[in-house]
């Protein structure tokens, strides 16, 4: 069963329920910054504070982009790269690509122009979808990368060297393209950007993506009533594959574009989040703010928050001990994986093993 069928099933079963929410904290950058200055999560001052879509609209947007790609000759075996900050359009674009039988190629938003060009050529990308944060970088290489390659722009004020995604998809049919897709078909190319040099391409099929959905749900017990708070970038297998648990259960997820302790707790409270994935520095910042009295737990509604998990880096046992002093009822898990192993969960601590915090964990579901 290809992963696109999960989206279509959710659109039929929960058409009017919220699937995705984007929270964009109202942080205005007063000084001029270059693309190199962007933090891990960058707010978009020109966007609305909060946007949401239902499962029906999610699927409809994916279908419209799929129809646009098909109308331009994109189909099975072709590659479509995504160069976007986290936003409400990111996942519908990803699934629109998959619905055509093409391969999605997420790109790290920290790539310099030469790295973008390198990845596009290495993966033999046919289409690049990019957002406003990347106009300068893409323009620098536009003459070279636009030869025999489509450039679609997501956002206002489309640059002259690209085509307007919003205007084009608005005129496309919202019907599913109906392209037959099997579990063995190639689905995505991810780039592993380690310390050994330029990015390396990793190929995954639809069976791998479906396995990632099952791993996440098995490890963290997502139900339809859960609400997942996602802060890290979606181009990374970690963030997207943790969200796959929400996809499998048809539950709501929140994309937060800010990492301050106040912003995180406000979002958990306002959106009724039950599962939050943090990185060590963000958890440390929350605890430090609580210790100083900068924020107070009684100012937020956090009773529904049941699970906090961390991955991607070593977790000091003292951090989780301190965390449990403020959140004694929280479940906790540590997740590790590789882009090659389709994201987190290759090994994990397990929510029942909090007394073993500091250990790398045990083989995850399906990895025994």
Model-identified regions with their sequence ranges:
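Conserved adenylation A10 loop of the ANL superfamily
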Residues: 47, 189-201, 213, 353
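Conserved pre-ATP/AMP-binding loop-to-beta segment of ANL
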Residues: 16-18, 170-191, 198, 221-227
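Conserved structural elements of the adenylate-forming
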Residues: 59-65, 183, 188, 202-223, ...
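Conserved AMP-binding/adenylation subdomain of ANL enzymes
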Residues: 210-227, 235-275, 289-290, 296
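Gly/Ser/Thr-rich phosphate-binding loop
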Residues: 248, 273-278, 287-355, 368
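Conserved AMP-binding/adenylate-forming core of the ANL superfamily
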Residues: 16-87, 91-95, 112-117, 166, ...
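Structural core segment of the AMP-binding/adenylate-forming
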Residues: 5-7, 71-72, 99-167
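ANL superfamily adenylate-forming
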Residues: 24-51, 135-183, 289-293
């Amino acid at each position: 069963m290809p992963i696109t069928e999960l989206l279509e099933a959710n659109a039929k079963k929960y058409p009017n329920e919220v699937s995705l929410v984007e929270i964009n904290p109202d942080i205005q950058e007063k000084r001029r910054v270059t693309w190199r200055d962007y933090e891990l999560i960058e707010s978009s001052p020109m966007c609305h504070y909060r946007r949401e879509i239902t499962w029906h609209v999610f699927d409809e947007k994916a279908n419209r982009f799929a129809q646009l790609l098909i109308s331009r000759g994109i189909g099975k075996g072709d590659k479509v790269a995504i160069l976007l900050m986290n936003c409400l359009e990111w996942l519908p674009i990803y699934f629109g690509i998959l619905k055509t039988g093409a391969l999605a190629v997420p790109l790290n938003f920290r790539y310099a122009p030469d790295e973008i060009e390198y990845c596009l050529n290495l993966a033999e990308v046919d289409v690049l979808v990019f957002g406003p944060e990347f106009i300068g970088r893409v323009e620098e290489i536009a003459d070279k990368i636009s030869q025999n390659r489509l450039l679609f722009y997501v956002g206002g004020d489309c640059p002259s060297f690209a085509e307007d995604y919003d205007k084009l998809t608005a005129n496309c049919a919202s019907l599913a393209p109906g392209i037959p897709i099997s579990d063995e078909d190639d689905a995505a190319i991810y780039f592993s950007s380690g310390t050994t040099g330029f990015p390396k391409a990793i190929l995954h099929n639809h069976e791998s993506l479906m396995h990632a959905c099952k791993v996440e749900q098995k490890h963290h017990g997502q139900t339809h009533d859960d609400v997942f708070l996602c802060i890290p970038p979606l181009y990374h297998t970690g963030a997207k594959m943790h969200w796959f648990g929400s996809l499998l259960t048809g539950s709501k997820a929140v994309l937060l574009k800010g990492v301050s302790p106040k912003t995180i707790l406000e979002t958990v409270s306002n959106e009724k989040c039950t599962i939050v994935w943090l990185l060590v520095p963000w958890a440390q910042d929350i605890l430090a703010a609580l210790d100083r009295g900068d924020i107070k737990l009684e100012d937020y509604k956090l009773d529904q928050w049941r699970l906090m998990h961390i991955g991607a880096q070593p977790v000091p046992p003292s951090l989780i001990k301190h965390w449990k002093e403020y959140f004694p009822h929280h479940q906790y898990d540590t997740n590790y994986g590789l882009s090659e192993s389709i994201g987190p969960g290759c090994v994990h601590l397990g929510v029942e093993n909090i007394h073993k915090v500091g250990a790398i964990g045990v083989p995850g579901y399906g990895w025994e």
